[in-house]
Amino acid sequence: MTDKPKQYVKEMFFRPQHLHFTGIGGIGMSGIAEVLLNLGYQISGSDVKLSPITERLAAMGARVFEGHAASNIAGARALVVSSAVDEQNPEVQEARRISIPVIPRGELLAELMRLKYGIAVAGSHGKTTTTSMAATILNYAGLDPTVVVGGRVGTMGGSNARVGHSDFLVVESDESDGSFLKLAPIIAVVTNVDREHLDHYPDLDAIRAAFLEFVNKVPFYGAVIVCLDDANVQGLLPEIRRRTITYGTTAQADMEAGDISCGPFASEFRLRYRTADLGRFRLHIPGRHNVLNAMAAIAVAMELEVKPDTIREALETFSGVDRRFQLRGQERGIAVVDDYGHHPTEIRATLDGARQCGFRRIHVLFQPHRYTRTFHLMDEFARSFHQADSLFVMDIYAASEKPIPGVTAESLVERIRQFGHRGVEYVGTLDRGVDALVAAASEGDLVLTLGAGSVYQAGEKVLERLRTEGKG
């Protein structure tokens, strides 16, 4: 018998209409916009600056405006906003004036999931890579999921979204503003829990409570997949009320990785799942943290009855995610890599992975991201760079935040020195950072740009300088 009420709701939701996205160039907003474009919606949007992301959406049929203005939302049935958009935005004010709904991004994502079998990946770090791996495996296995992820994925044609024709939806959730609590997945993944987004959460206990609420929203027939290597995740286990699958590098985990080896831009490991030896798996990305990310994705796939050999083949096709230890190029024997890492835990994991690749020396250009994060995690940042032979620090990328007195790149550099790093230097600007990297690097070295702001622009500049100056 047809489920007529559910079918009616689907038809009502997927009836094409005009939605406007304020901040459409954001990685999270653009993914949902792309999915809705492919479902036949009329999409418009605006952002402060146009970008390759907005150009892609425009080529797909979206109408994109540079800058925010009340006139941009003419004809829209609803306004979609990210947590970065406040009530003073002229488009929000116009939406209030003409009485059309203002929908948070997380709420719209939850509506998409309500009509699908949702797999949601959460965690303080590793979400994008884990989500991308899970999506790659499920698509390779023929499950044809719809996907929304916070990074551009090679196996998805360089996009951060895809529309599948099955009832599966794979999403990267967003704990930064608590919006992941709107989701109701049948499978929930937690990669780790850390002190992050302290502009939203008062303390670590509040963060832990939010993740616990998230996993306990899974229905009784669903599953929770968590990393047993993470101490804060271990602390959640006694209070998780749903069927739980653990993964990690300990024999206590349901899924255990062993015999881990990492080389230049690759990792291998042997996998045990309960009593079964699943054999060796190979990744084209380095680092123990990426082995853990892969294990979470493998656990999702096995929960959906994908065969181990299919999973192994799918992971061989996965080349990584944009800005996640991404090789930008090599010149004169010097590798230039870019990474989005902007939290101390991410930085340590990235540098540990880089060190395992066998480079002679590692030179880092780091751009701190947000004054609040730098303030709350100053000492953690100061402990995070000891695997870097030289470290050059740019000014803080504000990300719309107002400065905090005494919280500067210079104060961070001084704190890093106090914690024992002898090769740290304040450079301030991108161009001075490029100068410092070119002067420091020699054959066999790694140049690594780190941060969530504009620091990625340094990579191509370094490569061009190495080409033209014959540095080596």
From Swiss-Prot:
Coiled coil: none annotated. It is an enzyme of class 6 (ligase). GO terms for cellular component: cytoplasm. It comes from Solibacter usitatus (strain Ellin6076). This is UDP-N-acetylmuramate--L-alanine ligase. NCBIfam families: murC. One of its GO terms (biological process) is cell wall organization. Keywords: ATP-binding, Cell cycle, Cell division, Cell shape, Cell wall biogenesis/degradation, Cytoplasm, Ligase, Nucleotide-binding, Peptidoglycan synthesis. InterPro entries: Mur-like_cat_sf (IPR036565), Mur_ligase_C (IPR004101), Mur_ligase_C_dom_sf (IPR036615), Mur_ligase_cen (IPR013221), Mur_ligase_N (IPR000713), MurCDEF_pg_biosynth (IPR050061), UDP-N-AcMur_Ala_ligase_MurC (IPR005758). Cell wall formation. ATP binds at G123, S124, H125, G126, K127, T128, T129.
